[in-house]
């Protein structure tokens, strides 16, 4: 059903059973999958490609222009949102900066009210962004991450699978998989609760904990991880994933919270 006050151009591609609320605005060429809901006053801008079973809340904006001083508004770029993802009230997802590029949000994510995903970000499946958190441009996030309220992520950092970030914290360095992160660029141990909730095998949980202790035992964590990776000191996919995260050259990683060591 399309409300009589909604603006829906003929070029918009709507799937079956799509509901468009009052005063919602869709721009030319947008694509919305089957069984999706666009609530009142939402704005779906050109370049938006929204999957099946999604929802976009009131006053949310999908595919807004990048907040980049050098961006040319004539550039044709996109936002891709996976099936089952909810974009709640006032949330914003900006399109990519380069022609033909895409900002990507995976399947079954929850972008809570007033959260923000900047241009060229890639967010995995089943991620949760709590209210008022913000991802700068080009952030890369794995699957099953939980970003608490008020968290600020600097542009171009990476966030690994299964990460839990505490509220009102800030990061300008990469956050390895399966860890708890808090404050400013600090790690506070393994996200054991999150791993268990995802039914991670006990052997994998124990291995990630062991590797975490070895990587963060002292010295340069990337060097420590590299040695363990070369030795194939892992026997589970989770252990390998944890170590390989440190293999990308030229990166900086969050450090141990020294207060936690006391």
Residue map of PLM features:
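Structural signal for interior beta-strand "rungs" in well-ordered beta-sheet cores
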Residues: 1-186
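Terminal amphipathic alpha-helical/low-complexity segments used for targeting or macromolecular assembly
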Residues: 1-5, 10-11, 16-17, 53, ...
